[in-house]
Every structure is written in structure tokens, then in C-alpha cells.
Design a protein with these regions (language model features):
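Mg2+/Mn2+-dependent nuclease catalytic core
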Residues: 138-194
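Metal-dependent nuclease catalytic cores that hydrolyze phosphodiester bonds in DNA/RNA
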Residues: 1-155
Length: 194
């Protein structure tokens, strides 16, 4: 970890440094809060990089599409994306290519997923441009650090307006039906993140 936070503020740090917890003492993030609320303090400690020496950030492959969509939309960064020329992951060659990409720290997606991904990101960009926030300026992936008493807290909103009056949070979903998305908000505890 390269970044160290020593006082409350807004910081520009890497994704990896944020998830390694750059605060002076173990800090509370939305991920830790979810575990505290759903399970227990002991479970939260096991999933905290400063409280568990054996902690490994195991990003689930089920979030790959959302992770890449965020990187493309927020930072115009495709460096972690590798497109695999295969119809699915069932062949030996596709599995080997997928595993090699993961070993390099990349996120592999299939060609058909790449087309869907680019359409998704394009739609989000069009929506932002044409919406009420289209004239505002935002900084992506800023790290916010503050203290509540003696407890350090941190957050990493997708977009923070430069005048600090608005935070936007980009979410991907399997079902755009409003009722289904409301259920997803509860299931994924999005209310703790935003």
C-alpha cells in the first residue's frame, strides 16, 4: 500500500490502496458495515485488511461486468479488461485464457459480453449527458475519510461533484424493472453504500 491517510479529507488514491485501508487505524467502510449488520464483529474483523493478517481481497467473478463497467464509465480505463474469443467458458482453451488473465490481475470477459458492456456504458454516458447533471463537473473515485469520535470511516463514491453537492452511484443490474431493482437494493445493501 502506497497511500496513507493521516487526516480527514478527500483523496485521490488507487483502488488497491483504498481497499487496503489507508487510514491510521482500522476504518469502517460500507463493506465492513454490511458484514457487521448481517453477521457479527468477528466476521467483520476476518474481512478487514488491518484486522486479519491473512486477509485476501477475493473479488467475486460475479461482479466482473460491473467492475469493468465502472472502470470504463468512471475512469475511461480498459487496462484490466481482456476480451476472450470464445462463445462461453466451457472449452479448455477458454478456461485457460480466463485463468491466465486472472493470474495477471485482469478481468476476462467473453466477446458477446464485451459488446453488451460497451452498449451499457454508452447508454449510461448518454443518460448522464442528457440529464440534469449533464452540465455539472464530477471527479470519479475520490476517497473520503473522516472520523466519528475515535472511529475512522471511509467511502469511495463513484462520482463526487466538484462543488461537493451531489454524489452519483452507478449500479449494474440483471433486471431493470423498478420493483426488481428495489429488491436488489435491499439484497445488496446499496443503501449502506450511497
Amino acid at each position: 500500500m502506497n497511500a496513507k491517510i493521516t487526516s480527514p479529507g478527500i483523496y485521490t488514491i488507487s483502488h488497491a490502496d483504498y481497499h487496503a485501508d489507508p487510514c491510521p487505524t482500522p476504518s469502517l467502510s460500507s463493506s465492513v458495515a454490511k458484514v457487521l449488520l448481517r453477521q457479527s464483529p468477528a466476521h467483520a474483523a476476518m474481512q478487514h485488511p488491518k484486522l486479519n493478517n491473512n486477509y485476501v481481497n477475493a473479488e467475486s467473478s460475479r461482479f466482473d461486468l460491473g467492475t469493468i463497467a465502472h472502470a470504463l464509465l468512471l475512469e475511461d480505463d480498459s487496462s484490466r479488461l481482456i476480451t476472450i474469443e470464445a462463445d462461453d467458458w466451457r472449452t479448455k482453451a477458454a478456461k485457460e485464457a480466463r485463468d491466465a488473465a486472472r493470474a495477471e490481475g485482469k478481468i476476462p470477459i467473453l466477446v458477446k459480453q464485451a459488446a453488451h458492456l460497451l452498449k451499457m456504458v454508452g447508454t449510461a454516458r448518454d443518460f448522464l449527458r442528457d440529464s440534469e447533471v449533464g452540465d455539472m463537473t464530477f471527479k470519479p473515485e475520490q476517497t473520503l475519510a473522516w472520523q466519528e469520535g475515535t472511529t475512522w470511516c471511509r467511502a469511495r463514491p463513484d462520482w463526487l461533484s466538484t462543488d461537493r453537492t451531489l454524489i452519483l452511484d452507478y449500479k449494474t443490474t440483471d433486471d431493470a424493472n423498478p420493483e426488481a431493482f428495489i429488491r436488489q437494493i435491499g439484497r445488496m445493501s446499496y443503501d449502506l453504500q450511497s
